[in-house]
From Swiss-Prot:
Domain of life: Eukaryota
Broad class of the protein's primary localization: membrane
Keywords linked to the UniProt accession: Lyase, Membrane, Transmembrane, Transmembrane helix, Virulence
Gene: gliK
Protein name: Gamma-glutamyl cyclotransferase gliK
Reactions catalysed, as given in the entry: an alpha-(gamma-L-glutamyl)-L-amino acid = 5-oxo-L-proline + an L-alpha-amino acid
Cellular compartments per GO CC: membrane
Knocked-out gene: effects: Impairs gliotoxin biosynthesis and accumulates ergothioneine. Also leads to attenuated gliT abundance.
A biological process term (GO) from this entry: mycotoxin biosynthetic process
Membrane topology, from the record: Single-pass membrane protein
Amino acid sequence: MGKAALQDPHGGIWYFAYGSNLRLSVLENRGIKALDIKAVIVPSHYLTFDIFGIPYAEPSFASVAPFAREKKTTLRLGDSPASRDVPPVQGLAYLLNPRDYRQLVISEGGGVAYDEVEVHASILDKDGKPDPGATLIARTLQAKYPWRPNGAPSARYLGLISTGCKQNEPLTAYSDYIDSLPAYEPPTSLHAKVGGLLFLMFWRPPLRLLIRLIRVNTDQDGHCPQWLGWIILTLYGLMWSYHDNIHSKIWGRGDGRKLHFEETPAKEVPVRH
């Protein structure tokens, strides 16, 4: 699904947050005020980190992906053969007015890396259990170009998600899963630090310029022009290609331990709605 149409301008829009927006302060710092907040679970999707970021700083960002029908989704870390089951994603549903929802889409990249999709969410009670009779339909953001395997998110970014869960009682058990995920650790050797610094000094300025261009070139739904999106994707592609094939060979990698979300056939898989 591509971008979704906004609701009636006089009505609210439920937005499902699963990443750094779980911290209400992050949302408020973007000038967005929630009219209502519900802790929810989305049984049809799971949390991923398949949005490309910047090596040596923020290698990846959160997204969601749908569970495949009649298959089991597991997570394997790095080169380890061991895997574990992946739980449905949990987070917060924020009720936003159309203006704030548009601002949120702009703050998340103006539709360059994400598609807007609708999900069915079950509201959680204070013990973190879903209430079958309490559901809502929410908009959320899903990777437009999923990056597999996932790079590890930074400790800073993963910490925002973990703290956001811990600040909301129904999500405290889910925070244990978040805390078990690996985080990217910046290089510690002088050689690797110099390599990371040189990389960021070269690539960050043009990326910041493009982010500013997104904020001033968006339509009524918060999306940037197609030509600008193409430029941004091309620059990120060049940056990661240079990292993988040249820079990392000299200075070491800047994306941490890989997260492999894998789907395997299962004889009996619970139906997810």
